[in-house]
Amino acid sequence: MTIRPAYRPKIIKKRTKHFIRHQSDRYAKLSHKWRKPKGIDNRVRRRFKGQYLMPNIGYGSNKRTRHMLPTGFKKFLVHNVRELEVLLMQNRIYCGEIAHAVSSKKRKEIVERAKQLSIRLTNPNGRLRSQENE
């Protein structure tokens, strides 16, 4: 039986397009990552019509759906079995994600314990080798 989230609203993003850096399309040396324009005559900083938009607090997501995955859960990074037990009472709100540095031996233990505690994992199959018949 799969665990379903306690609350699963429709996740609405106010803006899905990336904010790009001013004149990054003009010069190859400028990356597209956002940098706030600081110049005294800058059109973007002065918010002229037709220029790139600047990120501000108004583009933030709804507080209830912020950091929520499409499944309706929020992520919690797990490094060992003990950290998994923190999610015991919150298993309908948070799901575990096994950290990158965890070995495959410990991953098996975490996946096993998560099944017992009925905690959902985002990456239960990560770095688990299947037995090959020789």
UniProtKB/Swiss-Prot annotation:
Record PROSITE patterns: RIBOSOMAL_L32E
GO biological process, one term: translation
CDD domains listed in its UniProt record: Ribosomal_L32_L32e (cd00513)
Family annotation (SMART domains): Ribosomal_L32e (SM01393)
Keyword Ribosomal protein assigned: yes
Annotated Pfam families: Ribosomal_L32e
InterPro entries per record: Ribosomal_eL32, Ribosomal_eL32_CS, Ribosomal_eL32_sf
GO cellular component, one term: cytosolic large ribosomal subunit
Protein name listed in UniProt: Large ribosomal subunit protein eL32
